[in-house]
Every structure is written in C-alpha cells, then in structure tokens.
C-alpha cells in the first residue's frame, strides 16, 4: 500500500481501532515501512513489522503467496480470494521461517501486494518532553531505560522512549544538551483534551534541510571548524523544535505527528541525509558516546554536523532482517 502510516491510523480511529505501535513519525509508506523494518519504536510491542500477521507477495508473473506463521489466523479461503481479486494464483504458506523472512525482506522476495496487520482498541498517547543539561541524568537513562530516574516527571515504565541529543556541547552551557520524550498508551473513551487531528507541525525542522546546501554554496566564505554561527543555528533549531521547558500533549496515534504538508507547502519533498545505527539496548550509552566523540573529532577537522541525534528504544523482533532483530537460537 502507498497509504501512509498516519492515514491508516486515522482510518482505523474512525472504527475505534489503532495500530499497536506508532513510532516517532507517521508519514512513511505503510508497505515500505514494513518491508524495510524502519518504523515503530514501541518498547513493549516492537516495530510495525512485528504487528504483521501475513504478507501477500507476488513471486512470479503467475504465482503469489500468502505467508503467515505456523498456526496463523488465515486459511486457504483467504489465499483463494486474493487470487481471484488480483488474477494471480495465490498459495497459503504457514511457516515460521518463511514468515520471519517475509516480514522484513527489503524487496528481495517479491512484490508486496497486501499485508495483514493486527489492530487494537483505540488508545491515545500521553506524551511528555523534558529538556536536560549536559550532565549525567539523561545519560543514566540510556543505560537503565527508566526515564523516571532523570527527574521524577516521566513514567517508570513507558511504552515509548526517545532522546534527541545536541551533537555538540551547547553554548551557553545553560542550554539543554538533550531532550527526553516518553509516551504512554491509554484507553481512549472520548476524553476531552485529546487531539484527534494532526496539529503539531514544526516548520523549523523542515527548514533545517536548507542548511547543508547553504553551507556548500558559501563554503569558501565560512570559517570552519567550530563556526559559532553554524553552532548557533543548530542550537536554535533544536531549541525551537523541542523547547527549554517540560511540555505535555495528548493525542490519538494518527494525530500526534503533523502531516507532511502545511499551508500548501509540501515539506515532504525536502530531502536531507541521515544514517541509522542499531545497538543492543545494553550498549545504548557507550554507543551514543562513541557517536558524540566522533562528531567532535570530525568538527575539529572542519566537518560539522548540522542536525540532531535521535535515540529510540524498541523491543526485539524475530524477523530475520529486522534492524531490531533479537538473538535467535
């Protein structure tokens, strides 16, 4: 499906349902997010691909397969129906190993026509974001994954936990070095104050896409390394997006994150560059420290990183190629 995760969330909400995991944004293609294993960061459920019940793959011009785990919820009638709908014979395959391969297959096993995904009763997200100085409190939570230890405001056992980290020591030192975001899933029964449509659109985060080409254009005129103007822009961007005080919000899963277009401007067409590193949760703190130290070394060589670092925790997966794959015996 080319439908985004957010659209599917909002369609499900109209039926009193929701996807079990929400991730950190919702503009991605639903099928693409599953096939690449790049969406969803629920500490108790896992990623989006961990909620998939079956995958319908076209493996040749004349054959398709409906893959599910052994003892899965579908029967041969489902495969027969898909075959009639699409005019390609479909075979039901109920096999744990095939299912682990098919859920996150990076496009290598065939063309995804359909996915069957679990849905749960509609819930809302209670979100808390807090700023932290360049001290030990937020670093300690990287190790314990217990955000309440940082300042007592966050829940002890959240469903979602994320850090946004400034790549360099902030100037002035009284500015936040990191922001902690936790979310809990709570049953939705029409409570007042819960946003049901996307309203939180941060234009500042999209404007950051203009910084790298701007630097490239005026590179000869910008003194590197450690240019205070660039550091100031990065700090201002992060402050503007995440603030300097604690903030709370309540929203349905399809409303917590803004759409990719706003005021007629398609911000989804702007493209930056990113990299993703996966650590075992026990190595989260040393892993982040290695990244921060590397960025500092690169800045000394004149290569400044104009952005932030996002750290998310997710339950391990049994899908073979999932970035969050757990150790399997």
Regions found by a protein language model. Give the residues of each.
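Noncatalytic alpha-helical scaffold of FAD-dependent oxidoreductases
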Residues: 1-329
């Amino acid at each position: 499906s080319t439908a985004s995760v957010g659209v599917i969330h909002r369609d499900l909400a109209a039926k009193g349902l929701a996807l079990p995991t929400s991730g950190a944004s919702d503009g991605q293609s639903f099928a693409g997010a599953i096939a690449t294993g790049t969406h969803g960061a629920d500490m108790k459920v896992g990623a989006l691909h961990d909620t998939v019940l079956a995958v319908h793959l076209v493996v040749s011009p004349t054959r398709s397969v409906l893959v599910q785990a052994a003892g899965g919820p579908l029967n041969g009638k489902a495969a027969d129906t898909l075959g009639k709908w699409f005019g390609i014979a479909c075979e039901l395959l109920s096999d744990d190993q095939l299912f682990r391969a098919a859920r996150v297959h990076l496009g290598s096993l065939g063309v995804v026509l359909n996915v069957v995904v679990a849905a749960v009763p509609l819930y809302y997200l209670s979100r808390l974001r807090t700023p932290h100085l360049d001290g030990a409190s937020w670093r300690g939570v990287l190790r314990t994954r217990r955000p309440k230890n940082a300042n007592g405001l966050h829940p002890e056992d959240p469903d979602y936990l994320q850090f946004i980290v400034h790549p360099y020591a902030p100037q002035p030192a009284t500015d936040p070095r990191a922001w902690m975001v936790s979310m809990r899933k709570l049953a939705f029964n029409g409570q007042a104050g819960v946003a049901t449509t996307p309203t939180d659109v941060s234009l500042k985060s999209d404007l950051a896409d203009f910084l790298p080409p701007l630097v490239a254009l005026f590179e000869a005129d910008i003194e590197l390394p450690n240019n205070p103007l660039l550091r100031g822009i990065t700090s201002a961007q992060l402050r503007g997006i995440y603030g300097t005080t604690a903030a709370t919000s309540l929203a349905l899963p399809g409303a917590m994150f803004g759409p990719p277009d706003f005021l007629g401007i398609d911000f989804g067409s702007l493209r930056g560059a990113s990299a993703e590193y996966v650590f075992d949760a026990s190595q989260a703190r040393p892993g982040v420290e290695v990244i921060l130290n590397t960025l500092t070394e690169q800045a000394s060589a004149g290569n400044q990183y104009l952005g932030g670092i996002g750290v998310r925790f997710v339950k391990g997966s049994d899908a073979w190629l999932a970035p969050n794959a757990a150790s399997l015996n």
